[in-house]
C-alpha cells in the first residue's frame, strides 16, 4: 500500500498530517498490523508486505492532493 501526497512548495511538514491520518485509519481498519515507511531512496529491496509507504511531493502551487 502506498500514500502519495502533494502540496505547494511552501508547506513545511512532510509527510502531511492528512497523509499520516490516512495511514493511521488504514492501519486501524487492518488490525494495526502495518508499519509506515517514509523515504525508501536508500533501500534496494522488496517492500515488506506489512508496510504502508508514504511519499511526499512539494512543488508549485498544489493546494493538496492525496492518493491511496
Report the location of each language-model feature.
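C-terminal substrate-binding/catalytic lobe of Rossmann-fold NAD(P)-dependent oxidoreductases
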Residues: 2-68
